[in-house]
Amino acid sequence: MTKSELIELLIDQQSHLPVKDVEQAIKAMLEHMSDSLANGERIEIRGFGSFSLHYRAPRIGRNPKTGESVELSAKYVPHFKPGKELRELVNLPENSEINELN
């Protein structure tokens, strides 16, 4: 699902809300979440999951085209850990089609 599809879905489900309000709410939420992660904060949404940063130590990588060694610097990468309710939801029997795709 893309951001546009999420906005359309919410507009369909919440038809009493103006389209612009839904768009602004989604954009503001994503912007605030991005800013929080950029500031090193952890985001927890109960029942859904949590977003945090994981540290990646510096290492030597390889350029896949040339095979040349490349020094990769240390960095932080966003990480999502699903909550218990989300893990259980995606593993329900009625979601077996999803599980068969993987």
Curated annotation (Swiss-Prot):
GO biological process: DNA recombination; regulation of DNA-templated transcription; regulation of translation
Residue stretches spanning the membrane: none
Gene3D superfamilies reported in the protein's UniProt record: IHF-like DNA-binding proteins
GO cellular component, one term: cytosol
A GO MF term: structural constituent of chromatin
InterPro entries noted in UniProt: Hist_DNA-bd, Histone-like_DNA-bd_CS, IHF-like_DNA-bd_dom_sf, IHF_beta
Xref: PROSITE patterns: HISTONE_LIKE (PS00045)
SUPFAM superfamilies listed in its UniProt record: IHF-like DNA-binding proteins
Tree of life domain: Bacteria
SMART domains registered for this protein in UniProt: BHL
Keywords: DNA recombination, DNA-binding, Transcription, Transcription regulation, Translation regulation
PANTHER family associated with the record: DNA-BINDING PROTEIN HU, INTEGRATION HOST FACTOR SUBUNIT BETA
Family label: Belongs to the bacterial histone-like protein family.
Assembly mode: Heterodimer of an alpha and a beta chain.
Role summary: This protein is one of the two subunits of integration host factor, a specific DNA-binding protein that functions in genetic recombination as well as in transcriptional and translational control.
Protein name: Integration host factor subunit beta
Native source organism of the sequence: Marinomonas sp. (strain MWYL1)
